[in-house]
Amino acid sequence: MYQSQSILDRTKADKNQPDLNQYRWPKDDLHFIPDWVYTSDAIYEREVERIFHGKTWNFVALEAEIPNSGDYKRSFVGPTPVIVVRTEDGSVSVLENRCAHRGAELCRNTTGNNKEFVCPYHQWSYDLKGNLQGIPFKRGLNKAGGMPKDFRNEDHGLKKLSVTTRNGVVFASFWQDMESIEEYLSPEILKDFDVVFSGKRLRIHGYYKNEVPANWKMYFENLKDPYHATLLHSFLVVFGLMVAGNESAMIADSRYGIHGTMASAKKEDKYAQINEDTKKEMRSFHDGMSLLDDRFLEFVREFDSPWSVTMQTIWPNLIVQREMNTLGVRQIVPNGPNSFVMMWTIFGYEDDTDEMTSHRLRQGNLMGPSGFLGLEDNEAIKFVQEGVRKSKSDTNVVKLDSGNTGTSGSLISEAAIRAMYKHYREVMGL
């Protein structure tokens, strides 16, 4: 059970514009991050307004999850519940999961198939495109009560979000005049995005969900921080998945600096070959570690890509993982400044052999809330949140590779984090 029953039950404390005049970014704006971006309720409310409800494409589903007419998935844009549904004409609608009558959340199931959506409170009903189609006792009873004569159903449907898809991935936005997803992501990010999502039909293998008691932005920072990868993760280093000597890169989109790809090429050896000087820098390296089942480390070269590992951050709520042959997406759902939910979807391809499916599932133990890698990230992020909440210090230092902002060819870099916060400050007005 999550600490807060439903991690997503948090409501906005104040719908008015929060007063942010008290907040001042450090003078060296690129190389320091103030603690209050992780802990302030006022900052969080503006993030919801300007980022999640602003001019961004938010991941909401994979088309493979809703293949048939009426199939739906309950999802989120920021903290806001939405319904992703396949309509009768084959298109995808994304609707705010809030009855137009009294605001009740009308869809509570995670997935299902419906011909319509009916609010449990007063039974108002909507079609799959969110149009209001039925109101009990609309004209009253015995010539008394009911809606006024000028009430128009077409004026009271569910809020419809802008929708786009790219090779089976569904994005939605509260912004009604969004640029194309291709423009939004940029060629640098699309290159590796399209390696995983090439248009091949996906096969969903399963889901994880976990709550992390930390600020949602920390998870984005973590995957724009290749510096930590070879220091925190013993598994990555010992078994050669990402080592300081491997060919690697941290790639940021050149337009906004908010999307990124952390990439590395695994060497052929199952176990890392690391010189003694490098070992001294990495306390996470432990000589003699091995696996009882070496099949876990096998890498099947299935893509036309130089990388064996790519971790993509797509602002503001999506991570696309390709860790050797385990594939998945992670959706970030914020729940105030000090908590977020991570929703994981693990998949393969419809044309995978049974052997390949078994291999993906076996290797899938790398990821997830208690995976060989996922567990350590969650704990480290929690430690940072505890530190910024309790300490009297007020800034974080991001000076590694200080000459770059955005893309870097070094793993010992925080350039992508700096690029993210440069854009963040512009959007947030900080």
Regions found by a protein language model. Give the residues of each.
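N-terminal pre-ligand scaffold of iron-sulfur
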Residues: 1-109, 159-165
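Rieske [2Fe-2S] iron-sulfur-binding domain
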Residues: 65-176, 183-187
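Short, charged helix-to-loop "capping" segments that act as catalytic/coupling loops
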Residues: 48-57, 129, 138-148, 391-394, ...
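Short Pro/Gly-enriched beta-strand edge/turn motifs at strand-loop
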Residues: 54-66, 142-147, 311-316
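C-terminal catalytic domain of Rieske-type non-heme iron oxygenases
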Residues: 3, 86, 91, 97, ...
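N-terminal short leaders/motifs
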Residues: 13-43, 111-125, 157-167, 261-297
